[in-house]
Each structure stands twice: as C-alpha cells, then as structure tokens.
Amino acid sequence: MASKRKSTTPCMVRTSQVVEQDVPEEVDRAKEKGIGTPQPDVAKDCWAAELENSSKENEVIEVKSMGESQSKKLQGGYECKYCPYSTQNLNEFTEHVDMQHPNVILNPLYVCAECNFTTKKYDSLSDHNSKFHPGEANFKLKLIKRNNQTVLEQSIEATNHVVSITTSGPGTGDSDSGISVSKTPIMKPGKPKADAKKVPKKPEEIAPENHVEGTARLVTDTAEILSRLGGVELLQDTLGHVMPSVQLPPNINLVPKVPVPLNTTKYNSALDTNATMINSFNKFPYPTQAELSWLTAASKHPEEHIRIWFATQRLKHGISWSPEEVEEARKKMFNGTIQSVPPTITVLPAQLAPTKVTQPILQTALPCQILGQTSLVLTPVTSGSTTVSCSPITLAVAGVTNHGQKRPLVTPQAAPEPKRPHIAQVPEPPPKVANPPLTPASDRKKTKEQIAHLKASFLQSQFPDDAEVYRLIEVTGLARSEIKKWFSDHRYRCQRGIVHITSGSLAKEQLAIAASRHGRTYHAYPDFAPQKFKEKTQGQVKILEDSFLKSSFPTQAELDRLRVETKLSRREIDSWFSERRKLRDSMEQAVLDSMGSGKKGQDVGAPNGALSRLDQLSGAQLTSSLPSPSPAIAKSQEQVHLLRSTFARTQWPTPQEYDQLAAKTGLVRTEIVRWFKENRCLLKTGTVKWMEQYQHQPVADDHGYDAVARKATKPMAESPKNGGDMVPQYYKDPKKLCEEDLEKLVPRVKVGSEPAKDCLPAKPSEATSDRSEGSSRDGQGSDENEESSVVDYVEVTVGEEDAISDRSDSWSQAAAEGVAELAESDSDCVPAEAGQA
C-alpha cells in the first residue's frame, strides 16, 4: 500500500484528493461465499446522475443503486465467521455475536505502514506517532487477519479534511468541495497538515465507485473495526448504508478528544466470560468498594483488573455518569424505582418527507458520542422510486433514562427548495414526562418522628449494625446514606459536647410528637396515594394479631410465613403492621394524656370497694382499641417484682424494654406503660416506699428475685411474746403511724417494715395508690379464723408453719380475685383489729 502512494505518475487533479477504498482480505472471502457485491455499471449511472445534481446544488449526497440493494437482499445476509450461523435479521445476528463470541481480538499486532514499525502495545504505537509523526491527525486504522493474527495497520490519509471522488472518462465535470472529515475516536488528536503530499493513483487504476461523503466514510471505517471486534464479517457495501445523522460542529478542533486504546496491559479478557462479573455489571455499572472486594474474592482476579474491566465495559456501552448521577441512580435502585434494562436494538419505521433537509438532522457537540443507558435504533427506509437508492440508516438515541444525556438535541430544519423525491427523516421523539426535580439528600429536612426514631436508636448504640439500619429505613423512610450521615454527625457532636441526648429529653419529645399526632390521617406509604387494599378476613386478622403480639417488627422469615398463611402480599402485610403500630402508639398516648394532674387527684380520692376512673378509662380504651381486649387485672408477685426492678433501674424504658417486659410478665403493653406513668407521678409526690429498698439491694438470685425482697415478704419464724401487743397498742395511742416511729417499732416487733405497716389501716390515698401500684400486699387479705374470727398479724410461733403456708397460698388466690375483692378484704381488716384492741 505504501508503494502505491509513492507512485510518481503525474495526474491533473483538483485540490481535493482521492481516497482509495481499502478492502481487507475478509471481503474477498465473503465474495467467494456468494454474498452480494456492488454492481459497477449501475453505480456508474447513478454516479453520473448524482454529479449532475450536485454540480447544480453545490452539495454532495450519497447514492446507492436500488438494483444493488435488491441484489444484496436476495443473495446475502449476516454470516458469522467463527461458526456456521447466518441470518438476515440484524437483531438476531447482534445477539448471537454478543452471547456466543464475546472475545474477538487476542494479542493484536499494530503496524505503521509509513515506517514499517511493528508493536504489540498500543502505548508503544502512540509513542511512535508522537516521535515520528508529530502534529499528524489523519490516521486511519485498518483491521486485517493474517494467519490467525489480527493486524491493525495504521496509515495516513492525505485528505486535508476535504474528500471528493474523481473518475476518468469523458463527460466528467468538476465537482465542488466535499464535506470535511474528522478522525475516528480511536485516532490521536492533533493539528491537520497544511499540505497534502500524497499523489493519487493513475487514472486507469481508479475504479468507478459510488460517491461517499466524509461522514459516511468515517463511519464505514469505524464500523468496520467495531464489527470485527464483535466477531462480525460484513461487506464493505453493506457498511456504506450506515451513516450517522450527525454533523461535526464548527469548533471540532477545539473540543477535547480522548483516544480509546483497544488493548491495555492490565485488561484481563478472561473476565468477559465470567457470569458473576456480567451479572454485577448488569445490576449497576459503578461498583462500590465493598462490591469490588466481594468480586475479587468471588472471581479470584486482582481488584485492579476488575476496575479496568468495569471501566472498559462502561466505555463500550457508552455509560458516563457524574458522581451525583451515580449516587441518585444508586438511591433509586435501592428504593426499587429503577429496573436494570440491558441495551436493546430496536428497528422502527421511518417517516418519509418530500422536502430537502439542508441542515443536519441531529447535532451533538462531540461526534458519535452517546452517553447514558441508551438503545440503538436502526431505521431502514424503503424507497418508492427506482431512480433513488436506499437512504442511509439513521442512528438515533432512544434513551431509557436521562442520566447521561449531557446536551439537548437540535430539531430538524427544513429548506423550501425540494431536491429529492424521498429522504430519510428522524422520527419525532416521544414527549418527555416532566419529572419533578430531585431534592438532594442533604437538603431534605427530617420530621420530628424520624428524628425521634433516630435518637432512640442512637441511645442504644452509636454504631448501628445492618439490621438496625434496615429497621430504621423501614420506620423512618430515609435512605441508608442519610441514616449513616446522621449517626456520624451526632457522634461528632456528642464527642464535642454540642449535643446531649438523654432518655428524659427523648421521652418528652416522643410525648410531644404523640400529642400533636391526634386527629391525623395516617398512610402506610406517604410517598404514594392512599392504598386501597382488599378487606381482610377474620382468620387473616387473627394470624396478623398473633404475630404482632410476638413482635411489632416482623423478621423476614416471619413475613414469609405470614404471606403463606394469610395469602396476602408483602406490601399489604407491611401496611397492616405499620397501621397497627400507629394505632398502638396513639392508644398509649391517649391513655397517658388522660392521666392529668386534675384527674389524678380525683382518682386518688376514690372510695374503697369501687374501681377508680383511671381503671374505667383504661378498660374502656382497651375495649374500643384492641381487637382482643383485656381489662386491668391484678398483678402477681413475680410481675410486680419485675416491674419494680425495671423502674428502679430506669423510669423511662425504651420500646425494646417495654416489649421485653410484656414478654416476661405476660401483661399487655398498655398496662405496663400505665403502671410506669402512675409510679412516676407517685415518685414525685414521695409516696413510693419500696424505691429505696430496690435501689440499695439490687442483687438477684437465680430466679431473678432480690433475696432481700423475698425475705421481706416472708413472715418471721419467731417473735417475742410481747411483740404481738406492740402494733395495736401503738395504733391505739397516736392513731397514726409516722415514718420515724416505724424505725423504732420494727426492731421491737421483729418483723419487716412492710408487714408492720400492713397491720395498720392505711389512709384512703395510700390504699388507692398501693392498689394502682399492684403492691405486694394486695394478696395479704385477712385469713379469718373459723373458731374465734380474730386475726393475729404479728404473733407467729414455730408450730404455726402450716398457717404460714396457708397464708402464702392465699396470696396468689387473692391476686386472682380482682380489684373489687381486694377492696373488700382491706375494709374487713379495720373492724377485726378494732375488736382485738
């Protein structure tokens, strides 16, 4: 090829140089197989007619003969040179190549035809060009197969950015200047040469050929290389039909261009057939560091190779996103709003118009640069006239998403002068749906409910695990990055002393939020319209209620079980649990709000033998709110002990501690919340007598009970004989039990302070408060003596151990009888003691 360029045969030509058509060896083999080739005679006629029109209109337009197109359709198709597969459908052929032959070029050989320089690395070729061909821009690469070796031959075109075709023979007129040609994306950028030093061929060697404008020739060379990269063996005349409807901008030399090497030293082609890598790329083209580490372990390849493989695949598919777009796409994919769609090839019918398009149909700032997740749309055009050849196939962009589209498209411009009967038009793009602008995560303000959930979790652990993060995502609706950022900021603020998060302040915020939440309409999914789910049957509601009593936040296994048993969808179950949690919280807050200071004073003065208004209110709200109501019941000794132990440790339990207490005691969660509310109020008034005992003696035995507390509730085995007269005599004289006198009285009577106070009739307020607390003396009703009807509370001898066991048995019996019977047993104690005195 170099010897042909150095031919010294003189020839009178125009300033536009002749571009020779290089046909590789594969084309000759394809001709031998019977695939259609151009017909020179018909091409001559079309070329002559086109020259006449172009001389009048000062334009150059590509023309292909209809007979050639029909001959190609009848004879040829698309044949794979690596296997016997052949088809006439471009979509099927492209899918076959992508699936069956992902690796095409292995160890390419780069050859510079001007200098006979040979290398196996593209970097070496680039260095060679910078040293021996400085400032050269018109490089051309031709792919040749020689003895199972792929050769990329580099040559220099003498086009001077103007391309035209001159033919020998009489009647050939001079044509106007051609269309400027730019280099392919593979070539190095640089300034064009000022003078063309190449001499064209002899006139007798110039074969008559179709007139190809610059951009069409550019795409022919590029498509030739790309087709062979994908394992395609196409004909040169077939590639002549593909012309991008883009025009090079006038400032093309000022636009920065990046050369794309076909091979790098670190690229590992073995990853092209790795199913794990392909699936990961199809899910998201920008892997995180954690995903890279996982892929390194799964594929047994270095991380640097995986990074380069991902970058190459993104370049191959035309994906170029900014960091902001990557973050937004990752958030949308996490929220389930993006479905990863692989690039598809779609064939759409084109519209025909009789007008002449003088301006480019499609314009972009960079030639043939497609950004984002796009689909390739090939628009074949059928012509109704025998004098006009097949119109070029238009390359349009049908974007799946709008992440990568950097510049707007220019609409077609029509001129009033008709020139051709038919010409291809770009189909109008579908109207875009106006999407609301996405608010950055940092600009979104969190609601009070979201902050309350985050603070409650922050009190538990400043470094939440994945399970806690997913729970917060479900509860608050925030993204994972937002939750992580909030925790990071508050850890820093807590270390600096800027923010102090305590359980007391958190409880006040939760109460304020719950108070402001009354009267609102709740939706399980605030980002969408109110969900209209079908009504649930009683059996489904019962199954859901049973699961809710176990845990208000079901696990994944529990959700799968509920879906199987209830036949409901995951979304319906999540919605039901969300509404049920809100109903529970609002009911608890209503119970707490109803216990004001005014109502509490009225409830304290309630007479014996009657339920207080607080108990009536709690029972009524439980009946109306819960599907399976449970009235306020008397608490057993074990339940009271667990509640008191927790209260001594913290007066404001967390939701998790409430759930644990409900599971351990068997009480309703609302009843536990009410008990803590009452005891907090009593603690402020100083009427909680057992608080000091639980604070100073927290040691528990194997069963979870304080040894001293159990000892206090157990009667003494022995007591002095005169000890039985101390308590009635003390009550008879001062008629009132004082706290300071109690310390003197306890050593003389040889019993605990609690049993000593039980021997005396308590005030109405103390009786009511003790009953609301569920204190341990609820079960100490009067055990009447059948013979004398006189109750002795203090004097106990060794021989009365049977009576002690009977009295302890009556403890549990009295606890199960209810609040009304407890009041009657308390009232019976007064006349009995008075008779004894």
UniProtKB/Swiss-Prot annotation:
Feature: compositional bias, Low complexity: 167-180
Protein keywords: Differentiation, DNA-binding, Homeobox, Isopeptide bond, Metal-binding, Neurogenesis, Nucleus, Phosphoprotein, Repeat, Repressor, Transcription, Transcription regulation, Ubl conjugation, Zinc, Zinc-finger
Residues the record lists as Phosphothreonine modifications: 37
Region (Required for homodimerization) residue spans: 195-358
InterPro entries hit by this protein: HD (IPR001356), Homeodomain-like_sf (IPR009057), ZHX_Znf_C2H2 (IPR041057), Znf_C2H2_sf (IPR036236), Znf_C2H2_type (IPR013087)
Chain segments carrying region Required for interaction with NFYA: 263-497
Top-level taxonomic group: Eukaryota
GO cellular component: nucleus
DNA-binding region: 263-324, 439-501, 530-591, 628-690
Positions of region (Disordered): 1-41, 167-203, 404-445, 754-837
Subunit structure: Homodimer (via homeobox domain 1). Heterodimer with ZHX1 (via homeobox domain 1). Heterodimer with ZHX3 (via homeobox domain 1). Heterodimerization with ZHX1 is not necessary for repressor activity. Interacts (via homeobox domain) with NFYA (via N-terminus). Interacts with EFNB1 intracellular domain peptide; the interaction enhances ZHX2 transcriptional repression activity.
Similarity comment: Belongs to the ZHX family.
Protein name: Zinc fingers and homeoboxes protein 2
Protein source organism: Pongo abelii
